[in-house]
């Protein structure tokens, strides 16, 4: 059973309906350093993901608002989110019950979920390196990467 509408598999053709439909993509990234008190601790898995979610959520909400405003500026554009949808928790997403998304006007797919290589993109175009969560340990920083597909 698939958990979130923003995650594959999709009922549309990713190449045709996303990548090939638009003439360019604008990539935006934000580097977020974690406080030392978070990076110096060890975590069990559930705690680690909870701390990560609590740290990232306000930044993701702010950046999502900004990129949705950019969609308004560029007619026919569509934004790509940084990671999973913020509007439902996994247990609440209507995909589990086979019903349509309740937030179709807000839900956006991520670059990764559409097959984009975010790591290579960040290195090549933003001259940065991604850091990843390791077992029991948080990275020094996270990078939130958004995209705007423009007709």
Model regions and ranges:
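Catalytic cores of enzyme domains
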Residues: 1-151
